[in-house]
A protein has these predicted regions:
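Acetyl-CoA-dependent GNAT
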Residues: 1-47, 55-60, 64, 115-116
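Conserved G/P- and acidic residue-centered "switch" motifs that form tight phosphate/ATP-binding loops
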Residues: 52
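Conserved short alpha-helix immediately C-terminal to the canonical SAM/SAH-binding motif I
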Residues: 57, 81-84
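C-terminal "cap" of GNAT-fold acetyltransferases
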Residues: 71-74, 78-82, 90-91, 97-117
C-alpha cells in the first residue's frame, strides 16, 4: 500500500534538520466516492507529539490533496484514539458517521469530514 502511495506521490514525510523522520501522512486525492481527498494515515512518532507536527501534516494534506473542485476532506479515526479525534475536531472536522467493526471486530471507526473554505 505505501509503495504504491510513494509512486503516486501521496506520501509526505516530516523530517527534522538531521533528516530524521518525525512523522508522515498518506492520502488519496480522489479517495472518497472517486471525488474527495481521503487521509489514510497520519502518524507522528511518540517522542515528537505535542509539537504541532500533526497539525503541520494535516495542513499539508488539506493544501495539497485537493483539486479546485474538491469541496470536502475525509478521514477515519478509530474509537481507541480519542486524542486524534480531538485534533481533527479542533481542525474543523465533524463526525458524519460511525462504522462499527470496520477494520476489526469490536473496534468502531468514525468517518469525519471537513468542508473546504
Amino acid at each position: 500500500m505505501l509503495t504504491h502511495a510513494v509512486v503516486q506521490k501521496n506520501v509526505y514525510v516530516a523530517l527534522n534538520e538531521n533528516e530524521k523522520c518525525l512523522g508522515f501522512i498518506y492520502y488519496m486525492t480522489n479517495g472518497v466516492f472517486g471525488s474527495y481527498p481521503y487521509l489514510h494515515i497520519v502518524a507522528v512518532k511518540e517522542e515528537y507529539r505535542n509539537y504541532g507536527i500533526g497539525r503541520q501534516l494535516m495542513k499539508y494534506f488539506e493544501d495539497n490533496a485537493s483539486n479546485s473542485s474538491s469541496t470536502k476532506y475525509f478521514l477515519t479515526v478509530d474509537d481507541f484514539n480519542p486524542r486524534a479525534k480531538k485534533l481533527y475536531e479542533n481542525l474543523g472536522y465533524q463526525c458524519v458517521g460511525e462504522l462499527p467493526d470496520f477494520y476489526k471486530e469490536g473496534i468502531n471507526c468514525y468517518l469525519m469530514m471537513k468542508r473546504r473554505g
